[in-house]
A protein has these predicted regions:
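Short, strongly hydrophobic alpha-helical membrane anchors
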Residues: 1-24
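Structural signature of hydrophobic alpha-helical transmembrane segments
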Residues: 21-38, 85-102, 151-170, 228-240, ...
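Transmembrane alpha-helical segments of multi-pass membrane transport proteins and ion-pumping complexes
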Residues: 32-45, 67-75, 79-80, 95-107, ...
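Transmembrane alpha-helices that form the ion-translocation and gating core
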Residues: 40-53, 62, 67, 110-184, ...
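Membrane-interface junctions of multi-pass transporters
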Residues: 49-61, 65, 72-119, 251-257, ...
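Alpha-helical transmembrane bundle and helix-membrane interface signal
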Residues: 110-115, 147, 175-234, 252-253
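Membrane-interface alpha-helices at helix entry/exit sites of multi-pass transporters
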Residues: 116-122, 184-206, 221-227, 302-307, ...
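Short, highly charged, low-complexity non-transmembrane loops/tails of multi-pass membrane proteins
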Residues: 427-438
Length: 438
């Protein structure tokens, strides 16, 4: 992969910045080494031990470490990764997004979807409608105030607002970092939370990806072209179907060999994500459709395939958080800060409400002091991937502003849940015990 990036760098112009005089190929190598090292470190046993600490788990769940590392490497910090270097790293970002889409798409197996309880479908639809409406409304208000004549070009706002709405849908499915007291009831509730998060992830990628299909990106002069959207969708479906059938055949030949299976999957992702990127389509959406095709064609190899993919899930998430840090915009004024914190605040108010309603429908009573009440507050890492996909499809100031807002919302919501949980535990702790803890 690094060799391919270095070869591709021959045609990438060197951008001005902190790396003047340093060969661009070497700078790409250093950037891959730094971001790749961060991703690999996230999956080590030492990192897993660190995550047992509540503060470390909270910071990493919101992507703080990786985002700060990306900011340090980007134009805001050391300027190791400037615009020219990011162009050289683009293939790596495309493959990473395709990988994430594939993991989510593999959950959309028809037999599994048929077995999903009605309460989870109800929860997903209700939460998606409310969350998308709130996020899009906040985005329209803030951008209307921050961007001059923003509503004079509604087509330019279509994909960004849809992306912002999609980023606000899902939540982090893991509950281990919340330090929940284990019981049969909390295990059932945690399972429902994870299942609904997976379903929301599918909806989020589909919403953002499909909304970008008819957009002919040209900054503020972007236009909507339904015929272009139809052609792009046809390309996506044809690529996913043809390559999926071929991958299914190859996977059946190597299902007992994990390394060979990984090679097949990486090649599969490179093809579908690369075709999508060349056609101006979100690699995240192409990965999702490819995963759906593969999940519904495969039988035996699927279980082994999922285990192979999930081994790299944490590393992939950290890699995308790092890229998000590189791409954040510091020249957008107050808009990203206001929008990010506003979305985080609405998540704190809205998500526990929809969670509580859904648990009542499922006849599961949430304990008043359980941290699970706050589980859906934390923005899913997928939100960052959705925002990065928008930047790849439409690299504009508006797209980077929304990416920055999504990153801020993720960091804030990632801290809000543990802080509220800590406050609840502190308020219920006996006064006499507090002295002995010091």
């Amino acid at each position: 992969m690094i060799a391919a990036l270095l070869i591709a760098a021959d045609g990438v112009p060197t951008a001005a910045g902190g790396g003047d005089g340093v060969p661009i190929g070497f700078r790409i190598f250093l950037a891959v080494l730094a971001l790749g090292g961060l991703a690999i470190a996230a999956g080590t046993p030492f990192s897993r031990r660190l995550h047992r600490n509540r503060a470390v788990a909270a910071l990493s769940a919101g992507g703080w470490f990786a985002v700060l590392a990306g900011i340090a490497l980007g134009p805001v910090g050391l300027d190791l990764v400037d615009e020219g270097i990011f162009s050289g790293l683009r293939p790596l970002v495309v493959v990473a997004l395709g990988w994430v889409g594939l993991i989510v798409g593999l959950q959309a197996r028809w037999k599994i979807l048929q077995a999903v309880p009605g309460v989870i479908w109800t929860w997903t639809v209700k939460d998606a409608a409310m969350s998308a409406l709130v996020a899009a409304s906040l985005g329209a208000i803030v951008l209307g105030l921050a961007v001059e004549n923003a509503f004079a070009h509604p087509a330019a706002l279509f994909a960004p607002l849809a992306t912002l709405a999609a980023a606000n849908l899902s939540w982090a499915p893991e509950t281990r970092s919340l330090r929940v007291e284990l019981s049969d009831r909390t295990r059932r509730i945690a399972t429902l939370i994870a299942a609904a998060a997976g379903l929301s992830a599918i909806v989020a990628i589909a919403l953002a990806g499909l909304a970008s299909l008819p957009v002919r990106a040209d900054g503020i002069a972007s236009t909507l072209d339904p015929l272009l959207g139809g052609r792009r969708l046809a390309v996506l479906l044809a690529t996913a179907a043809v390559v999926g059938i071929g991958a299914r055949f190859l996977l059946s030949m190597v299902e007992r060999d994990s390394p060979q299976m990984l090679v097949v999957v990486v090649g599969f992702v490179c093809i579908v994500a690369g075709v999508a990127d060349a056609a101006g389509i979100s690699p995240l959406l192409s990965g999702l459709l490819a995963g759906v095709v593969l999940a519904n064609l495969s039988t035996g190899p699927l279980r082994n395939l999922e285990s192979v993919l999930h081994r790299g899930e944490t590393a992939g998430g950290m890699l995308l958080y790092g890229f998000a840090g590189v791409l954040v915009s510091v020249d957008s004024g107050w808009a990203p800060l206001a929008l990010g914190f506003a979305i985080a605040a609405t998540r704190i108010l809205l998500k526990p409400f929809t969670l509580g309603q859904s648990m009542r429908l499922a006849r599961e009573e949430l304990p008043t002091n359980t941290p699970l009440r706050l589980a859906s507050v934390r923005q899913a890492p997928l939100a960052v991937a959705v925002a990065i996909a928008l930047v790849l499809v439409e690299d504009s100031t508006l797209a980077r502003t929304l990416l920055t807002a999504v990153v801020i919302a993720g960091l804030a919501s990632g801290l809000a849940a543990p802080l509220q949980s800590w406050q609840q535990r502190s308020s219920t702790a006996p006064t006499s015990d507090s002295k002995s803890d010091l």
